[in-house]
């Protein structure tokens, strides 16, 4: 588990709200019937949604689990006003068009979208569970339906003595990391207005995830093997055996079922973080460039690799309306950094250049590149993705605003392990930490511990050197 300021990041086993009377929200019988009768939609499934649904179905067919839920929570003072919470939850669901869709998957890989036509047909109703234990509360969250069912999202509150905990559990098919800002801010602001005796808060208009799916489909259909973006992705993948890169150390047998575990190590304290940023700036890079350079230098120390190939996510929202929209907009940027014989400054500049020049590649789904290629393959299990979270940038900055001070925000995975090894580099005022979510087995635990120790050594040597000497 990782705790930074008011934010906790971990798995569902780390979530520990004060136990008490619990209320969850789920679809009414009428809404469920309406959804089951929803017509087939001509809105294309986004590449991110398709990848997630296929991944879930393929892993399930192998007898393996698949991490699919994004769980967020926050605390509110006092006794929960269930009527107000009910209004806010239903307003949220009707506001965002992604919640109107559900999906069907057939054996040949085709995915069909069905969409509720009238958002007013969506109705979630409170279910009063009474006093529950912590394992029972977690079970409610864990049992959120899978992405092939409408209503693969659940909401609820757990009442404590002087406060209550609000939670949302949403399948990844409908959300990305901005769930922490969109969902929690909407609940917090709208609920506060209602219990304060005010009229329902008028939020800025949300955008349309359906529109994004159409734009992505139109754009992707124009791509060919000769498109510069496709050629860039192809060159990257050819450097990593025709697919995404592998983690530098063994992680156990990916064909064996595994839960997820998370380990966190503080890389730099507040002073060292400032020193590290100064070294990055002197090298002509930003903090993210320095982070990616350190990842590359750590891999060089562990394996002797001469070139670092990495992946880092990027939100592709571009407009104010997009920023208010629930959905999966996040793509991946491929990073290539020559490492052998490089001083940190050289590596940081190269990483920054690769990041900046690759930003637009996040709008090009790798799955589309594979469709166009005769040589590339889909990602292998346990490919690593480096997530950089900065207190000064979204989505983390949204959670550190004055409005959410004291709300004890939590962001959790469902404790299942899927296909991707997630590395989180988190920079806050107090310092810089790295958390790794990995398959919970002895081989992976040993490898992740070794990786984090090496990465910390690189970070600290850079910060303490105060110059761009070779730290590899």
Swiss-Prot record:
Q: Which GO terms describe its molecular function?
A: palmitoyltransferase activity
SUPFAM superfamilies tied to this protein: CoA-dependent acyltransferases
Give me the reactions it catalyses.
Answer: a long-chain fatty acyl-CoA + alpha,alpha-trehalose = a 2-O-(long-chain fatty acyl)-alpha,alpha-trehalose + CoA; a mycolipenoyl-CoA + a 2-O-(long-chain fatty acyl)-alpha,alpha-trehalose = a 2-O-(long-chain fatty acyl)-3-O-mycolipenoyl-trehalose + CoA; alpha,alpha-trehalose + hexadecanoyl-CoA = 2-O-hexadecanoyl-alpha,alpha-trehalose + CoA; 2-O-hexadecanoyl-alpha,alpha-trehalose + hexadecanoyl-CoA = 2-O,3-O-dihexadecanoyl-alpha,alpha-trehalose + CoA
* Enzyme Commission number, as recorded: 2.3.1.278, 2.3.1.279
Broadest EC class assigned to this enzyme: transferase
One Gene Ontology BP term is: glycolipid biosynthetic process
Consequences of knocking out this gene? Deletion of the gene prevents PAT synthesis.
Which Gene Ontology cellular-component terms appear in the entry?
membrane
Keywords assigned by UniProt?
Acyltransferase, Transferase
Question: Which domain of life does the UniProt lineage start with?
Answer: Bacteria
Q: Which family does it belong to?
A: Belongs to the PapA acyltransferase family.
Role noted for this protein: Involved in the biosynthesis of polyacyltrehalose (PAT), a pentaacylated, trehalose-based glycolipid that could have a role in anchoring the bacterial capsule. Catalyzes the sequential transfer of two palmitoyl groups onto a single glucose residue of trehalose generating the diacylated product 2,3-diacyltrehalose (trehalose dipalmitate). Although palmitoyl-CoA (PCoA) seems to be the physiological acyl donor, PapA3 can also use docosanoyl (22-carbon saturated fatty acid) coenzyme A as acyl donor.
User: What name does this protein carry?
Assistant: Acyltransferase PapA3
Query: What gene does the UniProt entry assign to this protein?
Result: papA3
């Amino acid at each position: 588990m990782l705790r930074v300021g008011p934010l906790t990041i971990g798995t569902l086993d780390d979530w520990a709200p004060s136990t008490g009377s619990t209320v969850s929200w789920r679809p009414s019988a009428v809404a469920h019937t309406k959804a089951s009768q929803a017509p087939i939609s001509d809105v294309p499934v986004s590449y991110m949604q398709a990848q997630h649904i296929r991944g879930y179905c393929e892993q399930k067919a192998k007898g393996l689990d698949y991490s699919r839920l994004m769980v967020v929570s926050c605390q509110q003072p006092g006794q929960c006003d269930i009527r107000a919470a009910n209004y806010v939850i239903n307003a949220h669901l009707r506001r965002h068009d992604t919640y109107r869709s559900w999906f069907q998957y057939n054996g040949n890989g085709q995915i069909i979208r069905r969409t509720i036509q009238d958002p007013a047909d969506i109705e979630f109703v409170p279910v009063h569970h009474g006093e529950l234990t912590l394992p029972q509360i977690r079970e409610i969250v864990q049992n959120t339906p899978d992405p092939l069912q409408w209503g693969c999202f659940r909401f609820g509150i757990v009442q404590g003595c002087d406060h209550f905990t609000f939670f949302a559990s949403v399948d990844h098919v409908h959300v990305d990391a901005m769930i922490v800002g969109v969902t929690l801010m909407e609940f917090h602001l709208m609920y506060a207005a209602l219990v304060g005796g005010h009229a329902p808060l008028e939020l800025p208009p949300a955008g349309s995830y359906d529109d994004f799916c159409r734009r992505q489909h139109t754009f992707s259909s124009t791509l060919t093997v000769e498109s510069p973006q496709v050629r860039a992705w192809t060159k990257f993948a050819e450097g990593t055996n025709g697919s995404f890169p592998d983690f530098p150390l063994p992680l156990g047998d990916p064909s064996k079922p595994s839960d997820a575990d998370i380990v966190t190590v503080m890389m730099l304290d507040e002073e060292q973080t400032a020193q590290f940023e100064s070294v990055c700036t002197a090298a002509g890079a930003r903090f993210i460039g320095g982070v990616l350079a350190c990842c590359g230098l750590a891999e060089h120390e562990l394996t002797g690799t001469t070139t670092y190939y990495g992946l880092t996510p990027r939100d592709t929202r571009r407009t104010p309306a997009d920023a208010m929209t629930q959905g999966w907009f996040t793509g991946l940027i491929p990073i290539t950094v020559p490492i052998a014989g490089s001083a940190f400054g050289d590596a940081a500049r190269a990483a920054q250049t690769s990041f900046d020049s690759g930003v637009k590649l996040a709008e090009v789904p790798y799955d589309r590149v594979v469709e166009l290629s005769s040589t590339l393959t889909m990602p292998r299990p346990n490919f690593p993705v480096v997530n950089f979270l900065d207190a000064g940038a979204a989505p983390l900055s949204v959670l550190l605003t004055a409005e959410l001070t004291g709300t004890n925000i939590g962001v959790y995975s469902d404790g299942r392990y899927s296909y991707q090894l997630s590395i989180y580099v988190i920079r806050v005022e107090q310092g810089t930490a790295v958390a790794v979510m990995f398959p919970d087995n002895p081989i992976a635990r040993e490898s992740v511990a070794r990786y984090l120790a090496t990465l910390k050594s690189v970070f600290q040597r850079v910060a303490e050197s105060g110059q761009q000497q070779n730290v590899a």
